């Protein structure tokens, strides 16, 4: 039982470890930040972290390259100044917008209407990244451009060195991103269901193994029904087959139905904790209901006579004897064998006498004349 509990705990630990590793591996596939590659007029680059919005189009796989323009007004809560007209057809422009004063979707929609291809919204008095969302379905349907969110320090660096007026340009680089609330929660639900099923399966298997082990072991009340004999010198058995120690006077021997005897201290743990069979001949000490039924069926099959039934049947197995009846059975067997020998001797004597009479008759017939011999033979026939 302790071994089964240990195996159950080990299996549960392994399952927990596997699920934990898979969960962390899955979380590693959920980056919360993308990258902004900024290049100044000297082609020096710098990378800034950003967080894509939950509305609008995704960034293209190859990234979005454009020139950065400061929004006018900065909060973009109303229509803003469009990008330069002379370069509008040949270049892509990205607008930098300040947070607060209105919703994110309004800011991005105003940037889209002004002609910008992407929008960057920066935080105020903080470098924390916020996931931009919207509750207005009508506004969401109108937004087509991508947008990202950055911290205030990143926005100040972009304004100082990487704007369009200072000869800089940006590349918004997308990264593999999965919405956490859409993928992690179903994943955790599936993992939880699998874990519950595994635990139920392991508990069921543990209970079945425990019941099976109980059926294969001997109960205390069944053990008490087996006879116990105190060993005396001259008894039939001399060595315990389990501990290989010779029996001494006064040793308590447990006598099994198969007539094998063992020390009580040796065979009792075997019967109650391992199997209810004889350690030597493997015969069951207390047959179960299924065993008795199978024995009855097999005996009925043996009694049925078919075309495959052998002419000479094998000898039936000798029934189990008690420890005290062994000597009587052996003496009875010796007496039976001696009586069989006497009957065989009598039969041999009778057959030899009959053969002697036949031989004497033949001798008499040969000594008589031919006519008389023929007469006697004819009378005999």
Swiss-Prot record:
E3 ubiquitin-protein ligase that regulates cell proliferation. Involved in apoptosis regulation. Mediates ER stress-induced activation of JNK signaling pathway and apoptosis by promoting ERN1 activation and splicing of XBP1 mRNA. Also involved in protein trafficking and localization. Residues 1-34 form the signal peptide. The keyword Transferase applies. Its EC number is 2.3.2.27. Residues 285-381 are annotated as: Disordered. Widely expressed (at protein level). In normal pancreas, expressed in islets, but not in ducts, nor in acini (at protein level). GO terms for cellular component: cytoplasm; cytosol; endoplasmic reticulum; endoplasmic reticulum membrane; endosome; intracellular membrane-bounded organelle; late endosome membrane; lysosomal membrane. Changing residue 114 to P: Found in a tumor sample; uncertain significance; abolished localization to endosomes. Residues 35-182 are lumenal. It comes from Homo sapiens. Changing residue 270 to A: Drastically reduces E3 ligase activity. Its main location: endoplasmic reticulum. The gene is RNF13. Interacts with ERN1. Residues 292-304, 339-357 have a biased composition (Acidic residues). CDD domains: PA_C_RZF_like, RING-H2_RNF13. It catalyses: S-ubiquitinyl-[E2 ubiquitin-conjugating enzyme]-L-cysteine + [acceptor protein]-L-lysine = [E2 ubiquitin-conjugating enzyme]-L-cysteine + N(6)-ubiquitinyl-[acceptor protein]-L-lysine. This is E3 ubiquitin-protein ligase RNF13. The RING-type zinc finger domain is required for E3 ligase activity and for promoting ER stress-induced JNK activation and apoptosis. The chain crosses the membrane at residues 183-203. Autoubiquitinated. Changing residue 243 to W: Abolishes ER stress-induced JNK activation and apoptosis. Abolishes interaction with ERN1. Does not affect localization to endoplasmic reticulum. It is found in: Endoplasmic reticulum membrane; Late endosome membrane; Lysosome membrane; Nucleus inner membrane. One of its GO terms (molecular function) is ubiquitin-protein transferase activity. Changing residue 43 to A: No effect on glycosylation. Pathway: Protein modification; protein ubiquitination.
């Amino acid at each position: 039982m302790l071994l089964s509990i240990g195996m159950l705990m080990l299996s549960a630990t392994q399952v927990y470890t596997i699920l934990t590793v898979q969960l962390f591996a899955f979380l590693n596939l959920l980056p919360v930040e993308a990258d902004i590659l900024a290049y100044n007029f000297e082609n020096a680059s710098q990378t800034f972290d950003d967080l894509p919005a939950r509305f609008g189009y995704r960034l293209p796989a190859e990234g979005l390259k454009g020139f950065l323009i400061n929004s006018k007004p900065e909060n973009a809560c109303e229509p803003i100044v469009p990008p330069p007209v002379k370069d509008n057809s040949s270049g892509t422009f990205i607008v930098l917008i300040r947070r607060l004063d209105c919703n994110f979707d309004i800011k991005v929609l105003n940037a889209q209407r002004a002609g910008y291809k992407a929008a960057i919204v920066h935080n105020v008095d903080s470098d924390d990244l916020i996931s931009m969302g919207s509750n207005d379905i009508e506004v969401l349907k109108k937004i087509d451009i991508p947008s990202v969110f950055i911290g205030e320090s990143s926005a100040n660096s972009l304004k100082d060195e990487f704007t369009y007026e200072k000869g800089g340009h940006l590349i918004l680089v997308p990264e593999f991103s999965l919405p956490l609330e859409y993928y992690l929660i179903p994943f955790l639900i599936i993992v939880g269901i699998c874990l519950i099923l595994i635990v139920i399966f392991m508990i069921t298997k543990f209970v079945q193994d425990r019941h099976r082990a109980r059926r294969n072991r001997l109960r205390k009340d069944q053990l008490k029904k087996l006879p116990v004999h105190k060993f005396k010198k001259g008894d039939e058995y001399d060595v315990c087959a389990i501990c290989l120690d010779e029996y001494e006077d006064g040793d308590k021997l447990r006598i099994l139905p198969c007539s094998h005897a063992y020390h009580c201290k040796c065979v009792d743990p075997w019967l109650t904790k391992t199997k209810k069979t004889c350690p030597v001949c493997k015969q069951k000490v207390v047959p179960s209901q299924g065993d008795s039924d199978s024995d009855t069926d097999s005996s009925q099959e043996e009694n049925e006579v078919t075309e495959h039934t052998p002419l000479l049947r094998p000898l039936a197995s000798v029934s189990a004897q008690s420890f005290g009846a062994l000597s009587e059975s052996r003496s009875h067997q010796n007496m039976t064998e001696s009586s069989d020998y006497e009957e065989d001797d009598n039969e041999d004597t009778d057959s030899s006498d009959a053969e002697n009479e036949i031989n004497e008759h033949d001798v008499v017939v040969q000594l008589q004349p031919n006519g008389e011999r023929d007469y006697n033979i004819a009378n005999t026939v």
